[in-house]
Amino acid sequence: MNPLIRRFNPADEYYFEEGCYIHELSNSPDDPLMSAARARLPLGGQTRWHRLHNVVERYLIEAGEGVVELGGQAPQRVSAGDVVVIPAGCPQRIRCIGEQPLVFLAICTPRFEPDCYEDLDT
C-alpha cells in the first residue's frame, strides 16, 4: 500500500438495498483490514435487519437521532457522538427518529465486501 488521500465527492453517494444512502470513503483491496463509509438515513428511514459475516462494524454517529437494535438487546437511542460496536454475525438495524437525517460513519474490520452482507428480512 502506498500513502494516499481519498478525496470526498458528495456525488459518489448511492442508495444501498439495505435501506440507506452510502458514500464509500475508503474500501479497497489495497487496504483489506478496514473500510469506512458514510451512511445517511432520511427522516423516518430504517435499515433492513441484516448481519455481516466475519466483519466487526462500528457506527460513529455524526448527526441526528436514531434507535439501534442489536441481536436480542432492547432498542437503544443513539445521537451525535455515540459509538455503536457490532460484533461479527450480530443481527442489526437502525432507524432515524429525529427531525434531521441520521448520519453516521460505518467502520468495518476487515473491510466490507458484498459477500459478507446477509439480509435477514427476506
Where are these regions (language model features)?
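A short, N-terminal "cap"/entry segment at the start of jelly-roll beta-barrel domains
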Residues: 1-34, 48, 116-122
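Short intrinsically disordered coil segments
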Residues: 40, 56, 119-122
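A structure-centric signal for secondary-structure junctions around beta-strands
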Residues: 33-35, 55, 101-102
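Conserved hydrophobic/aromatic beta-strand scaffold that supports enzyme active sites
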Residues: 22-24, 36-40, 58, 75, ...
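A short beta-strand-loop-beta hairpin characteristic of the jelly-roll/cupin
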Residues: 46, 52-80, 90
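Ligand-binding loop in jelly-roll beta-barrel domains
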Residues: 30, 75, 80, 88-114
